[in-house]
Amino acid sequence: MLAVAIVACLLALTVFGGGTDTDAAELSKEDMKKSDLSTGCCVHDPQVLYDSASDKYYMYGTHMTGAAGDNLTDFQMVYDGVRPSNKMFSNLFDIPEGEKLPAAFSFVGKNDQRGYSVWAPSIIYDETMGKYLMYFCTTSSFIKSSLCLATADSAAGPYTFEKILLSSGFSRSTVDKTDFYEVCGSDAKLSDYVRNGSFINTLWPNCIDPAPFYDRDGRMWMTYGSWSGGIFLLELDPATGDVIHPDADPDNGVDKYYGYRLVGGGHHAIEGPYITYDPDTDYYYLFVSYGNLQANGGYQIREFRSKDVTGPYVDEKGEAPNLENGDDFNKYGCKVMGNYSFPSQETAYKAPGGQSVFTGRDGNLYIVYHQRFDNGTEDHEPRVHRLYETEDGWLVAAPFEVTGEGDTADSLMTDIKPAGTWYLVKHRLDVTKKVRQAKKTTFNTKGTFEGDYSGSFTVKDNSPYITVELDGVTYQGVLAKGTDEAGNSVIYFTAVGNDNESLWGVHYVSE
């Protein structure tokens, strides 16, 4: 496969470089290889960490799942299942003397199945502590959750549960089981958080889906939240891993207990936040999942960005969903991807989400997420795609799973003129179970295309940047080459429009 990939890249450079016509080397639909890719592991809400100390990749996810690999295409399961015999944690299920529940579940208790729920871990290396910090959540209902901290001496674990950091879903009768009054003071106004005896979940967050990261100055932060009151942000103390509670500033969306309000609220379907800082663009990028996570739930990945870590985070239109406009939340956020199918895929992809972003061994940015399929099941697998920076500073995803790193990774192409048959997928803003099938179009060297879609395009000289005009929308993106999941050589572009929709185009290349 490595030799084939290298030959394909050399062919692409020969046929497509220098602004030449691209249809001479195209692969017909009938001759395409087709496949159903299987990664061999099952991790929901995956986070990937490249650990330079061991030169390995570690992937952790919901239900105490974990995998490890020497590269991005071959992960092996290491941990699986919420049970004491799973050695991801050394002490998570230990019950303190005199107590009835393990400490991590002291507030949330057991779930409806009378078991324990452990969701969405995310790991960061803390240089101050010299420890790997795992932030994760325990939960028992759609609002009753605790954000927790565990530590380890290696990325592989085992992790030692340290403490509960934050809780949601409390009532007047249960708030004393949390640190709310310890943080906010004995005279804190509980009625701002509890109404008619119940937690105001449309206003305040569900304490799940934590994601730690470093800002441009090396300070540690954690974003978190799911549905409920939206996505929030708190700074972290590098000496302890604990949260730093800010001074309250209600006029600017800052709460003493829960921190900085970023996007969402009103119990709308926005969850799984992840923030990454890109020094090349000097932007912070906030990725979230919209919709319901089931195969037919319309799950999808959206993107916002900000010049400041605490926001405001906005989309291509300079907007974001909030407590006032949340009923139309699907209009906001650049859509990274949703349900789609290309002709080389035997089964359509559905409900991508639960994403995180990381820098690989090769220095490239990648996005990892769980992927469901149009096969009548709720089976899912992790997928890793390359991320690129557009000329105007948005991050866009490659259409296919990675097939290599470094010299064998997908790479940008400069000074080409797309021509021949291209398959276009337009990721629309609706939250739906509908699959966006690739539309066949013909590109010509005069800068136009026609077929199922008709429009125009320009490629900036001596650069990978492409601009596509389609249905009154301007898409800005990049051109790249690589290999699809079936092993076909491809030229593709990935772009985001000024209407927040994204556009993928794929040209299949004969070898």
Locate each region found by the language model.
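Carbohydrate-active catalytic/glycan-binding domains of CAZyme proteins
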Residues: 23-511
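Generic low-complexity, intrinsically disordered sequence content enriched
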Residues: 5-6, 14-17, 76, 96
